[in-house]
């Protein structure tokens, strides 16, 4: 994707300011912010500083007729951007950059931006629910919710915005809801949902059907793995069963339900082989999968913690940021995910995310390489027609 294509997307976001008083174009401010975040900026002052240092380069792609806005102007403008419009642009942009292939595993999970709280205004930290493609390590979209407990309402909103056809959607127990399962099936996709106590009857049925002693000599479809790390050996057993008579009532309640899945994890110390713990996790799925596919799917879902949440915290300083004005925390979170997608997709620059950000800060040639790194699908006029209706 060319830099001009990115600018085309940015330019569609509505500017709510009084145009007669505007000194700095919204597209210029957003382009500056995206480039600065890619280059390692985490605060408003750092975004302004980047702009002053790279003004001549920025003028190649934007107007910047009145130079670089001060940090407070950047903060005020970004904080007033319509968050829903931004979310739609983000998703449309990612669909241009990343063509989802049939059968991809898409993990949906939430993360609290810890620094976004504001005690003075009695405002708690916001919670972002993201869709993450495990195959390519990119974020496909995000939706904000005011608390983790509101994920149940945020997940359907995110599902509505995404093209999920023929993919497997994995969600933890918070998203194990009948309406969410139905929504996924309506989107022509399949689900793999973790089952815990919030679905009491279903969870109890699993406990009755799959007690611990059944695993010692299980005759059905199973797949096991072993992993030795930090002096511990962990054995994981995965089993998949068709829906049995005990679960026939649940077939009517959960749209498309086909498989009952169980993951047993047994940990022991390597030296004395003493047991450290056994955990059992239950899942339901609409996909006609076997035990090996199930093992791969739940492993892929766990990767969102390290491949997305951990990277945002450690490599991109998301939790440390005190940006919290208006919609700013949500918008900057989305821009950081855009930056992360671009940095990961750029193979011309060697190194991890942190090293790439430092290289981008040192040389504008690297910025151009990163911005052009998304798959060259181009900006289609049919997309522009839809986006102008935001």
From Swiss-Prot:
Pfam families: DDE_Tnp_1, DDE_Tnp_1_assoc. GO terms for molecular function: DNA binding; transposase activity. InterPro entries: ISAs1_transpos, Transposase_11, Transposase_11-like, YbfD_N. Keywords: DNA recombination, DNA-binding, Transposable element, Transposition. GO terms for biological process: DNA transposition. Belongs to the transposase 11 family. This is Putative transposase YncI. It comes from Escherichia coli O157:H7.
């Amino acid at each position: 994707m060319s830099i001009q294509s990115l600018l085309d997307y940015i330019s569609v976001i509505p500017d709510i300011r009084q145009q007669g008083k505007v000194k700095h174009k919204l597209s210029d401010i957003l382009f500056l912010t995206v480039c600065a975040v890619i280059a390692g900026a985490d605060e408003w002052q750092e975004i302004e500083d980047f702009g002053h240092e790279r003004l001549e380069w920025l003028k190649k792609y934007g107007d910047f007729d009145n130079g670089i806005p001060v940090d407070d102007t950047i903060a005020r403008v970004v904080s007033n951007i319509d968050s829903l419009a931004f979310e739609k642009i983000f998703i449309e942009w990612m669909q241009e950059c990343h063509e989802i292939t049939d059968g991809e595993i898409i993990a949906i999970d939430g993360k609290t931006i810890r620094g976004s709280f504001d005690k003075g205004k009695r405002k708690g930290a916001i919670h972002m629910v993201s869709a993450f493609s495990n195959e390519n390590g990119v974020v496909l979209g995000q939706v904000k919710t005011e608390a983790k407990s509101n994920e149940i309402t945020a997940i359907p909103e995110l599902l509505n915005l995404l093209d999920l056809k023929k993919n497997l959607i994995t969600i933890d127990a918070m998203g194990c809801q009948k309406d969410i399962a139905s929504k996924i099936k309506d989107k022509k996709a399949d689900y793999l949902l973790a089952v815990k106590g919030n679905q009491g009857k279903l969870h109890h049925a699993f406990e009755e059907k799959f007690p611990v002693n059944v695993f010692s000599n299980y005759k059905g479809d199973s797949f096991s793995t072993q992993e030795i790390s930090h002096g511990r050996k962990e054995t994981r057993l995965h089993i998949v069963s068709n829906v049995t008579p005990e679960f026939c009532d649940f077939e009517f309640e959960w749209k498309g339900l086909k498989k009952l899945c169980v993951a047993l994890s047994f940990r022991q110390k390597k030296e004395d082989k003493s047991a450290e713990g056994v955990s059992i996790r239950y899942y339901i799925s609409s996909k006609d999968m076997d035990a090996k596919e199930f093992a791969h799917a739940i492993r892929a879902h766990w990767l969102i913690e390290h491949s997305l949440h951990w990277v945002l915290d450690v490599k991109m300083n998301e939790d440390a940021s005190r940006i919290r004005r208006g919609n700013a925390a949500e918008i900057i979170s989305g821009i950081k995910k855009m930056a992360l997608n671009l940095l990961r997709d750029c193979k011309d620059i060697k190194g991890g995310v942190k090293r790439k950000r430092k290289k981008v800060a040192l040389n504008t040639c690297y910025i151009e390489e990163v911005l052009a790194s998304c798959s060259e699908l181009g900006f289609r006029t049919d997309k522009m027609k839809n986006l102008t209706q935001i």
